[in-house]
């Protein structure tokens, strides 16, 4: 006689912590498309959030701070090794590069204002500089991307730091993809591309293929900016 208390196979599969209905649906979609899925907004998988950010104490490398009577400073200085004008942040967090197009003009301006209020920096992201964002940013990174969309040496000279885009967590190993619905006339003009169609960026930079080439490219930007600003990698 069958044990009526034993879970059925359907129940066991339904409780799988790995192959959830969402994961199975994603597999089916990829099988039908024959490639990875592309959409705007964010990743499908859960990612770390602010509540999971933790700083490890350096109790052996320096004296600890008595929190109830001493002030803890979070000031961070970047680029002091090579740059004549290192960038100073009040907190060790900055607004990473998100392009105009992926974000609206209002969103870019709001992030710039918020970063300035917090004493930190924001980044141009892909597609070049938009003047309102730069105007509201007290500290601003100019991003050099694989496609060179919107790249302007004159805008680079207005930056407090330069950032080479190599990869990002949302699309590891893949290039950029801006959906056609977001490619307005203004976005298209900045990138010198047609409006209303998807815009793709290559997965790697066209003028360097390894560490030696990257070193030369960094040196090129240092000389172009007269060693004034820091250079970092994303």
Model-based region annotation:
Residues 113, 128-129, 134-136, 148-234:
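Alpha/beta enzyme core
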Residues 122, 140-142, 231:
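Hydrophobic/aromatic residues located in beta-strands of well-ordered beta-sheets
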Residues 1-93, 97, 102-116, 120-121, ...:
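Conserved, well-structured core domains of diverse proteins
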């Amino acid at each position: 006689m069958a044990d009526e208390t034993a879970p059925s196979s359907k129940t066991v599969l339904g409780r799988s912590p790995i192959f959830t209905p969402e994961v199975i649906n994603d597999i089916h979609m990829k099988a039908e498309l024959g490639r990875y899925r592309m959409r705007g907004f964010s990743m499908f998988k859960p990612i770390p959030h602010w509540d999971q950010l933790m700083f490890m104490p350096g109790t052996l490398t320096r004296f600890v701070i008595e929190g109830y009577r001493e002030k803890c400073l979070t000031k961070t200085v970047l680029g002091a090794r090579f740059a004549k004008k290192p960038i100073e942040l009040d907190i060790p967090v900055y607004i990473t590069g998100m392009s105009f197009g992926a974000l609206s003009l209002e969103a870019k301006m709001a992030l710039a204002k918020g970063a300035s209020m917090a004493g930190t920096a924001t980044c141009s992201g892909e597609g070049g500089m938009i003047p309102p964002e730069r105007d509201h940013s007290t500290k601003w990174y100019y991003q050099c991307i694989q496609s060179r969309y919107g790249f302007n040496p004159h805008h680079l000279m207005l930056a407090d730091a330069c950032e080479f885009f190599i990869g990002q967590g949302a699309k590891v190993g893949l290039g950029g993809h801006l959906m056609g619905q977001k490619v307005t006339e203004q976005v298209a003009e900045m990138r010198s591309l047609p409006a209303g169609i998807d815009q793709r960026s290559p997965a790697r930079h066209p003028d360097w293929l390894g560490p030696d080439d990257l070193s030369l490219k960094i040196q090129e930007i240092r000389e172009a900016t007269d060693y004034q600003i820091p250079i970092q990698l994303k």
